[in-house]
């Protein structure tokens, strides 16, 4: 029978000092012996996805106490990738994931907490907390802040939906007037919540449902909707129940590593492929799997990408649908339900509800359960009112979207594309693989051959695109931006957005050992592994080299004889200490970033720490 971890500091005469300190936090005599549950919040006023979380921790805490636990809240950092984008701040985004994981581990182990409720939302916070949950392997539930409502405005007397990416693209388009840019800017992000499309934040929150670690609706219920409050309350109640099952009934099946099995990771990746999620999710799932001790690799993602179709096309892959539309169509359980009917889901994996995925789908899939209460839950919709307050409206759609032939979510017979929304490409320029979000690529350029134009930094690439150096037919190569080479593996949202602004969105490709925002679309290929700084062949590309991209055959190659590549590699190695480093790049790199870069592995390993260096 497992003993409460917190007993280390709450039981025995020798812990009188620790108990005295616990009492000073508000604990009473009858609290000692109850499970101490860490409420891991991530409130900050810097990030719209987290600005409304200030009171969420205490909301959960009070429910934990009602259910018989002791709640203690602490906060993690949270970086807004959109605000950090396009300048040196982006170097800190990915490293913050590992810092969050470490900080949660530090706090929970230092204070011997028995369980966690993780309140996350945006890009690196959810994966960082997931990594910590796998390390700690104590009862854990995830509940996120929820998606932002889609922006809406009238331009040229036409009502259009907007999001952050529209503001970025239109602001760089000389054909768009200052007045229209102003309207777009002020309409793109109308409420609190994670940016309204299937960008990285919402993708990761959706994947927690498929992993089995969050409640149904977590990924899709709007941040502003009153119904989301119940997810927080239920998380507080459920974590106490799970604690009792583990610590009192010797039930290890409720622990994160028991739920997030290899099959659960396959379910999560299949969902990601089916919904055309952010390519960053690949990086994060690989990292979380390593922390969980699960042997889930790029080869598994490649295998799944060849059999799972794309069943939903959501912003940034289309302007028609945003997260509010996904929820109306049945949310993540709606997509998983269609994958299940197609025979593409492991049905017997367990979830945090104590159900198998099959049992959970029977309750929460709107196609197989026509219960009015469930119907009402998924009719929760946007209000269209600017606000930073959670649970501030209770608007509902008149009907759910259960049209699986033409709606937001499709069945297998009416798939958006038979090819999935993400693909892994291999070749002599990326021997360990690279990632492309095929859901965001026009099918006319799934096969593309072009001349390389090489940049040693994102900043130089932006200048080259806006300055007219990049022409139709180019493959823009941005290297030394990987986890080690950046260091920090910046997102390349501005280069991809500016290619569209310059009318080159369907006329060029972009290849990088960096990564992309979840808001990226177009022929944008990232995570090239090994990265240039680790001796990857992307570091050997010269201007005007021919690069062939073949998505259907999952191939990407530098059209050069092996002998020429060997000559170039030998010449690079001859540079000694200057080998595999960018030329003429001026970049201030702090000690903290140098430490991250020193230990970072390439993207195919999730950019986690290289433990052989410890």
Swiss-Prot record:
GO terms for molecular function: 2 iron, 2 sulfur cluster binding; dihydroxy-acid dehydratase activity; magnesium ion binding. The lineage of its organism: Bacteria, Pseudomonadati, Pseudomonadota, Gammaproteobacteria, Pasteurellales. It catalyses: (2R)-2,3-dihydroxy-3-methylbutanoate = 3-methyl-2-oxobutanoate + H2O; (2R,3R)-2,3-dihydroxy-3-methylpentanoate = (S)-3-methyl-2-oxopentanoate + H2O. The active site is at 517 (proton acceptor). Belongs to the IlvD/Edd family. Binds 1 [2Fe-2S] cluster per subunit. This cluster acts as a Lewis acid cofactor. Keywords: 2Fe-2S, Amino-acid biosynthesis, Branched-chain amino acid biosynthesis, Iron, Iron-sulfur, Lyase, Magnesium, Metal-binding. This is Dihydroxy-acid dehydratase. [2Fe-2S] cluster binds at residues 122, 195. Homodimer. It comes from the Bacteria. Mg(2+) binds at residues 81, 123-124, 491. Pathway: Amino-acid biosynthesis; L-isoleucine biosynthesis; L-isoleucine from 2-oxobutanoate: step 3/4; Amino-acid biosynthesis; L-valine biosynthesis; L-valine from pyruvate: step 3/4. One of its GO terms (biological process) is isoleucine biosynthetic process. GO terms for cellular component: cytosol. Its EC number is 4.2.1.9. The modification N6-carboxylysine is found at residue 124. It is an enzyme of class 4 (lyase). Its cofactor is [2Fe-2S] cluster; Mg(2+). The keyword Iron-sulfur applies. Functions in the biosynthesis of branched-chain amino acids. Catalyzes the dehydration of (2R,3R)-2,3-dihydroxy-3-methylpentanoate (2,3-dihydroxy-3-methylvalerate) into 2-oxo-3-methylpentanoate (2-oxo-3-methylvalerate) and of (2R)-2,3-dihydroxy-3-methylbutanoate (2,3-dihydroxyisovalerate) into 2-oxo-3-methylbutanoate (2-oxoisovalerate), the penultimate precursor to L-isoleucine and L-valine, respectively.
């Amino acid at each position: 029978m497992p003993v409460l971890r917190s007993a280390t500091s709450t039981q025995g005469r020798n812990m009188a000092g620790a108990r005295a300190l616990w009492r000073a936090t508000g604990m009473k005599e009858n609290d000692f012996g109850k499970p101490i549950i860490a409420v891991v919040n991530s409130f900050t006023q810097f990030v719209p996805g987290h600005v409304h979380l200030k009171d969420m921790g205490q909301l959960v805490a009070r429910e934990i106490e009602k259910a018989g636990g002791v709640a203690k809240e602490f906060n993690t950092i949270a970086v807004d990738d959109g605000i950090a984008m396009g300048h040196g701040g982006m170097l800190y985004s990915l490293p913050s994931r590992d810092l969050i994981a470490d900080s949660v581990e530090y706090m929970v182990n230092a204070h011997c907490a028995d369980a966690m409720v993780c309140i996350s939302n945006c890009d690196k916070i959810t994966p960082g907390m997931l990594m910590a949950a796998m390390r700690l392997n104590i009862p854990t539930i995830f509940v996120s802040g929820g998606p932002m409502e889609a922006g809406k405005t009238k331009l040229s007397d036409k009502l259009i939906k907007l999001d952050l990416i529209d503001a970025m693209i239109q602001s760089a388009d000389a054909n768009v007037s200052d007045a229209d840019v102003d309207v777009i800017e002020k309409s793109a992000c109308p409420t609190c919540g994670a940016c309204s499309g299937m960008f990285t934040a919402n993708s990761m929150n959706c994947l927690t449902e498929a992993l089995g670690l969050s409640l149904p609706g977590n990924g899709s219920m709007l941040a502003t909707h009153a119904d989301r409050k119940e997810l927080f309350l239920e998380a507080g109640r459920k974590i106490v129940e799970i604690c009792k099952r583990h610590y009192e009934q010797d039930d290890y099946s409720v622990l994160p590593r028991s739920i997030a099995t290899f099959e659960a990771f396959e379910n999560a990746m299949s969902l990601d492929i089916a919904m055309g999620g952010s390519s960053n999710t690949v990086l994060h799932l690989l990292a979380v799997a390593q922390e969980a001790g699960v042997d889930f690799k790029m080869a598994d993602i490649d295998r799944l990408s060849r059999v799972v179709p794309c069943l939903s096309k959501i912003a940034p892959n289309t302007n028609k649908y945003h997260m509010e539309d996904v929820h109306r169509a049945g949310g993540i359980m709606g997509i998983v339900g269609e994958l299940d009917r197609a025979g593409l889901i492991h049905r017997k994996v367990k979830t945090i509800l104590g159900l198998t995925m099959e049992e959970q789908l029977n309750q929460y899939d709107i196609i197989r359960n026509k219960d009015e209460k469930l119907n009402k839950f998924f009719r929760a919709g946007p209000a269209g009112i600017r606000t930073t307050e959670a649970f501030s409206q209770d608007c509902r759609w008149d009907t759910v979207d259960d049209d699986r032939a033409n709606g937001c979510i499709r069945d297998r017979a009416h798939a958006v594309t038979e090819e999935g929304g993400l693909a892994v490409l291999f070749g002599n320029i990326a021997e360990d693989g690279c990632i492309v979000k095929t859901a965001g690529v026009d099918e006319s350029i799934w096969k593309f051959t072009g001349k390389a134009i090489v940049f040693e930094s994102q900043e130089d690439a932006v200048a080259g695109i806006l300055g007219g150096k990049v022409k139709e037919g180019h493959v823009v190569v941005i290297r030394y931006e990987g986890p080690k080479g950046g260091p920090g593996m910046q997102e390349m949202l501005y280069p991809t957005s500016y290619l569209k602004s310059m009318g080159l969105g369907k006329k060029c490709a972009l290849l990088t050992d960096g990564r992309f925002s979840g808001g990226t679309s177009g022929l944008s290929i990232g995570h090239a592994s090994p990265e240039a700084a680790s001796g990857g062949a992307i570091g050997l590309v010269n201007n005007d080299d021919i690069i062939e991209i073949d998505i259907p055959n999952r191939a990407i190659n530098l059209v050069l004889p092996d002998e020429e590549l060997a000559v170039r590699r030998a010449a690079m190695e001859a540079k000694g200490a200057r080998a595999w480093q960018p030329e003429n790049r001026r970049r201030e790199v702090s000690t903290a970033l140098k430490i991250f870069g020193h230990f970072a592995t390439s993207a195919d390993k999730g950019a986690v720490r290289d433990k052989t260096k410890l």
